[in-house]
Amino acid sequence: MPKMKSKSSAKMRFSVRAGGTIKRGQAFKRHILTKKTTKNKRHLRGSAEVAKADIKSIRSMLPYA
């Protein structure tokens, strides 16, 4: 059986941690930042975890992760 393909967009957006949780980047921090407060932008720094409801669908997009 041939190898399964991973979704390219999912490869760029998600990474699987050692414990099995999936890491994602924060949204709303690319542009239109002038109207956002410094506190708001500070809270958008770093990464976040994917919700439990979405883990199954993301794992199917990344078969070898």
UniProtKB/Swiss-Prot annotation:
SUPFAM superfamilies: L35p-like (SSF143034). Signal peptide: none annotated. Coiled coil: none annotated. Residues 1-10 have a biased composition (Basic residues). Residues 1-21 are annotated as: Disordered. GO terms for molecular function: structural constituent of ribosome. It comes from the Bacteria. One of its GO terms (biological process) is translation. Keywords: Ribonucleoprotein, Ribosomal protein. Pfam families: Ribosomal_L35p. GO terms for cellular component: cytosolic large ribosomal subunit. HAMAP family: Ribosomal_bL35. Belongs to the bacterial ribosomal protein bL35 family. This is Large ribosomal subunit protein bL35. It comes from Polynucleobacter necessarius subsp. necessarius (strain STIR1). The lineage of its organism: Bacteria, Pseudomonadati, Pseudomonadota, Betaproteobacteria, Burkholderiales. The gene is rpmI.
